[in-house]
Amino acid sequence: MSLKAIAKQLGISVTTVSRALNGYDDVSQETRARVEAEAQRRGYRPNTFARRLKMGTIDAVGLVFPVRPAPLNNNVFLEMVGEISHELARHDIDLLLIADDEQADKHGYMRMVQGRRVDALIVAHTLDDDPRLAQLQASGFPFLALGRSRLAQPYAWFDFDNYAGTCRATRHLIQQGHQRIALLGENNNQAFILQRRNGYLDALREAGLSDAWLRSVPATRRGGYQATLELLRLPEPPTAIITDCNTHGDGA
């Protein structure tokens, strides 16, 4: 099924049909919708290889995630990967998972960049001072950070207000009368972990309370379980526990 047939049926040019199907922003939403509906009705599938040659794209996005801790054991992370993959697939774009070891001399994501094997990168579990983002920014390669970092220039990022979450939770417990409040936090320097820890600590300082029940533990159920046992065995155990991830909560 050719573009000419779609163009003839809709009474528009082949160029307009092509630009609509390839996502150009100079095509109106109404025209794009008509073209996509007609293409779907006819079972039209674009020649992906030809489109890649013409557009100079790979039609692939890489998702960079750390080897340690193992985020693939986290159901929330897996759900996020599934949603990203689903949305990209709607635009005929593949998602490549790239495990990155920050202790390695060479990084897989840079091989992808240098070999032009992806069009862009999504970098998950960012660090507060992240050399990966700095390297990508210096190279001019397009990326989206899932988390915030300290970079010299503005960059695209998506994140939750991690600081506000633990700060509000801690304040709520204080208002309920708790004075010995624990936090089970992950034991690494990823940006969201530091933000959650700081929210907890600042809320305690506001109330003049001790942070003696702060614990940094592996992001596993066992880590949460063992840390909770240790806290409950203290002469003055906490009366409330905040966890910064679902696996800690399961263990607690």
Q: Where are the regions a protein language model picked out?
A:
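N-terminal helix-turn-helix DNA-binding module of bacterial transcription factors
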Residues: 1-59
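A general structural signal for well-ordered alpha-helical segments in protein cores
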Residues: 3, 14, 32, 50, ...
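Acidic active-site catalytic centers that drive phospho-/nucleotidyl reactions
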Residues: 5, 19, 119, 161-162, ...
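Bacterial carbohydrate/catabolite-sensing allosteric modules
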Residues: 9, 41, 83-91, 137-145, ...
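Short beta-strand segments enriched in small/hydrophobic residues
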Residues: 16, 55-70, 172, 180-187
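Short glycine-/small-residue-rich Rossmann-like dinucleotide-binding loops
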Residues: 22, 126, 246
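Alpha-helical recognition/docking segments in bacterial nutrient-uptake
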Residues: 60-171, 175, 231-233
